[in-house]
Amino acid sequence: MQNITDSWFVQGMIKATSDAWLKGWDERNGGNLTLRLDEADIAPFSADFHEKPRYITLSQLMPLLANTPFIVTGSGKFFRNVQLDPAANLGVVKIDSDGAGYHILWGLTHDAVPTSELPAHFLSHCERIKATHGKDRVIMHCHATNLIALTYVLENNTALITRKLWEGSTECLVVFPDGVGILPWMVPGPDEIGQATAQEMQKHSLVLWPFHGVFGSGPTLNETFGLIDTAEKSAEVLVKIYSMGGMKQTITREELVALGKRFGVTPLASAVELY
């Protein structure tokens, strides 16, 4: 019988967290990752579940997520250590029937708990389920270096940051035509930043936390990692451009419109019309 640590979802979390650490996006215990599962994903591994699963009450009701299992990273856990001890650094949790709390079915050993950003994750999952008709299953938060750097030098508004990232790399408009949401600086952890993030997730698959990091959403771990990786690559290009004196030429408005038509995507209007 296969052990849960060999399952596609545990192995996927190991790869995503290891890759993110190697990218330099998740120093120490920075960053967190959650993947929405189906009952059929976890049912074959019930023999590996805790005999007496701990129950933790949520800070607010999440009826949309009732009876839904997730695999999550733990609070205070280092991404670089997930591959060394998955059961200590990851956990499979399942929301109860009324969305009031969850049981820790597997992992998070030694009384560990899920990430402190769980409210932001679960609220964002709710919005992305509605926005994508259930297709999006992953929420990833990391400290992508160049995206953070841009929040210090660009005006922090969605239209401008989206437009600059589109100009930084041709593929960006195709990968995130819905643009990049951005919050004001907020204290991480509490429900307030989670609610603000979820509100932006209604419209955008990427949301920046200024001077802190980025949230990304997608249908798979691979797609979500690639989404953030694409935006971060463009941000790196922009950081180099600004350090060399700024743009002398760039992708024009007309070219962005043509790009959207070629790939059948509708670019965020406020970013297209900015200049």
From Swiss-Prot:
GO cellular component: cytosol
GO biological process, one term: rhamnose catabolic process
InterPro entries documented for this protein: Aldolase_class_II_sugar_metab (IPR050197), Aldolase_II/adducin_N (IPR001303), Aldolase_II/adducin_N_sf (IPR036409), Rhamnulose-1-P_Aldolase (IPR013447)
Pfam families per UniProt: Aldolase_II
Keywords from the named record: Cytoplasm, Lyase, Metal-binding, Rhamnose metabolism, Zinc
Reactions catalysed according to its record: L-rhamnulose 1-phosphate = (S)-lactaldehyde + dihydroxyacetone phosphate
SUPFAM superfamilies: AraD/HMP-PK domain-like
Location of this chain's protein in the cell: Cytoplasm
Protein name: Putative rhamnulose-1-phosphate aldolase
Native source species: Salmonella typhi
